């Protein structure tokens, strides 16, 4: 970007609503109350354990990366051709068998709904998960798999990536189309597995480096490749469980590695991330690059939604722009922004759980409204897309009121009830707000906020959480303990699941089911 472009971006930024308050909740309501509540409770959390306490066999980090394992088949995108073909061939009367977990020690203990309800308020127990049953015990009654009526989803316009390939996945530069006339670097071939290994090695390293372990040309090629995948899949993803749902991570790369340690590195688990990958944290580049590479490697089992921070104006203010400028160059930031503009917006899991970064919108009448959002697109100052990324639930008298963030609205319990009833959903799962325990229910467990960045910004002693949805639509939570950077480095150094164990992690034995 030249100097003129920079001035244009600055003038556009000036016209955007004020973000003087913290935009990752709570505006005043949550963040300030957290400081008072959490400041006196550091020691009370020591008895709460996380799944990262589980021991595994130790391996040295390999000098030559073996290939990553193939993903579970057919993937969890219900509109993927593999899923549709599978269910066209199956007898509708066949029932699925209950699978066993490849890592039983990492699976959260499932509680009955009544037990979970009684334990939800006792967060200082030794268990790292609290199961709830917000969704219907039976699958939605439909004649075919979810999304089977969405014809465009089966038209894959991007390159076909070899999911079942046993050897290293190499994407030649000829398969990566460049549609941006301002491409910062020449597109190069991608050795996806080797790049993933490089990034994970950085995550386990005790030293932080100013430089990025990937070259600018490699970063550009990653963005180009993943952008094609985003555009080849629907704006509204329709997924089948099991899946793990992750909230904000905000460039806290070491905590992202801890999250994968706890929940399983891909493809041992299916993932849906709810956005806000960059800004605030010190390693936004490593964070977003690892997520993009996993999306390229496992396109039908690893999904990323757009958050309000995946936007040019916000990244200019909250750190990602400065990190790109300092560690790469401004053109790399522009390439990321062009990729962010292609991210999907929302997801429906098993036809019952509506997932989005922010919340609801008064402009949202039908799910087709989301499907018809054009991409690539910037985030507008108001309207449907802005609300989906920015709105918050609140105890207000009116259905819709102005948001104290200065952007979008807040919506009350009545709006939630009407939305769920109209679309036959049971739960809204969203992120966008820091909460003390990593997850927090609202309105009789019809809405859940998930936040996955523990010790947020190094200032709040909050836990991180991941919501797991199993094939029976039972939801549970795995918690990430808040640690400072020194403690995180010590934990990762002692980790029993680094090195080759990552690459030998088997695919999920829970075969994804259409509902």
Swiss-Prot record:
UniProt-listed Enzyme Commission number(s): 3.1.3.16
UniProt binding sites for Mn(2+) 1: 248, 250, 276
Family the entry assigns: Belongs to the PPP phosphatase family. PP-Z subfamily.
Cofactor: Mn(2+)
Entry's Gene Ontology molecular function annotations: metal ion binding; phosphatase activity; protein serine/threonine phosphatase activity
UniProt-listed InterPro entries: Calcineurin-like_PHP_ApaH, Metallo-depent_PP-like, PP1_catalytic_subunit, PPPtase_PPZ/Ppq1, Ser/Thr-sp_prot-phosphatase, STPPase_N
Protein name, entry field: Serine/threonine-protein phosphatase PP-Z
Record Gene3D superfamilies: 3.60.21.10
Organism domain of life: Eukaryota
Residues at which Mn(2+) 2 binds: 276, 308, 357, 432
Species name: Schizosaccharomyces pombe (strain 972 / ATCC 24843) (Fission yeast)
GO CC annotation terms, alphabetical: cytoplasm; endoplasmic reticulum; fungal-type vacuole; nucleus
Catalytic activity: O-phospho-L-seryl-[protein] + H2O = L-seryl-[protein] + phosphate; O-phospho-L-threonyl-[protein] + H2O = L-threonyl-[protein] + phosphate
GO biological process terms on file: signal transduction
List of catalytic residues: 309 (proton donor)
